[in-house]
């Protein structure tokens, strides 16, 4: 079983540039002795709202009025977690009216309630795409691991399902993956060759691209998983409201926003 840490926009892959054509030379040299001036409290506050741009500011300020201890370690260490199964969530909302379940400022993650007719789930938004990676179970090829254990073993903050796994007659062990995955540069399994299967890959520049599952893996891909279907590519909806066997069931999907944020959606 492969697992990934962390209305999406996933870009189709452009042509791969020559690694030797680096743009680093265009950057101005940095003086290692130059110190960075600490942000004032007001600047820290504005930086927080800029990072978590989706927050409804008035609802967050009302939450702080009720819970002033939230700021005891500063704006960049705000930690709110009411995302547990038995929790009701916070009284914080996004500008679109969605309930906020958790905010982890240090790790730049926000959890948002997603719900509709007959379903609900959680959307995790990771602001720093460089934190995302794919990991394998300790018993890859033989047995899988509970997600919680896999995340803890690899120093992660949160995780979700990646590839599917071989499960003949419901008796699989979770250790043999279906399709192909790449985890931190190492490939596992074999590509799906059936039509409709896609591969989503993360490249060295922390961009996600969706391509056909049987296409060649580019040299700059660091992590990848394969499954079906692709829901959104370049802002275009690729499937209808009911896709073959999917319907309303527990599902997981991953994508990337126009701001390069990692979107990890789990429907319960």
What positions do the PLM features span?
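Solvent-exposed loop/turn segments at secondary-structure junctions
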Residues: 130-131, 164-168, 216-217, 250, ...
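Short glycine-rich loop/turn motifs
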Residues: 118-123, 197, 248-253
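Active-site-adjacent helix-turn-beta-strand microarchitecture at beta-sheet edges
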Residues: 166-243
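Structural recognition of the beta-strand scaffold that forms the well-ordered cores
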Residues: 157-161, 201, 209, 253-255, ...
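Short acidic-glycine loop/turn motifs at beta-strand connectors
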Residues: 126-130, 201-207, 234, 256-260
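Zymogen propeptides
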Residues: 1-190
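Domain-core and long-helix interface of multi-subunit machines
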Residues: 233-268
């Amino acid at each position: 079983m492969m697992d990934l840490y962390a209305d999406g926009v996933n870009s189709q892959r452009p042509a791969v540039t020559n690694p030797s054509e680096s743009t680093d030379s265009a950057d101005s040299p940095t003086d290692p002795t130059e110190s960075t001036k600490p942000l004032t409290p007001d600047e820290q506050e504005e930086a927080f709202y800029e990072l978590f741009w989706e927050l409804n500011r008035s609802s967050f300020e009302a939450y702080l009025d009720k819970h002033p201890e939230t700021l005891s370690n500063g704006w960049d260490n705000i930690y709110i977690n009411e995302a547990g199964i038995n929790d009701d969530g916070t009284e914080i909302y996004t500008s679109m009216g969605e309930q906020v379940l958790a905010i982890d400022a240090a790790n730049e993650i926000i959890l948002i309630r997603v719900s509709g007719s007959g379903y609900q789930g959680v959307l995790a938004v990771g602001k720093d795409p460089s934190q995302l990676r794919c990991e394998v179970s300790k018993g890859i090829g033989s047995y899988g691991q509970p997600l919680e254990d896999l995340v803890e073993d690899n120093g992660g903050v949160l995780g979700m399902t990646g590839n599917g796994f071989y499960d003949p007659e419901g008796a699989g062990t979770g250790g043999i993956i279906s399709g192909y995955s790449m985890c931190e540069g190492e490939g596992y399994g074999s590509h799906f060759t059936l039509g409709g299967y896609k591969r989503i890959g993360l490249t060295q520049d922390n961009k996600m691209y969706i391509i056909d599952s049987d296409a060649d893996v580019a040299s700059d891909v660091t992590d990848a998983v394969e499954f079906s279907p692709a829901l959104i590519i370049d802002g275009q909806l690729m499937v209808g409201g009911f896709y073959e066997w999917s319907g309303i069931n527990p599902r997981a999907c991953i994508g990337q926003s126009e701001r390069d944020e990692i979107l990890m959606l789990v429907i319960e």
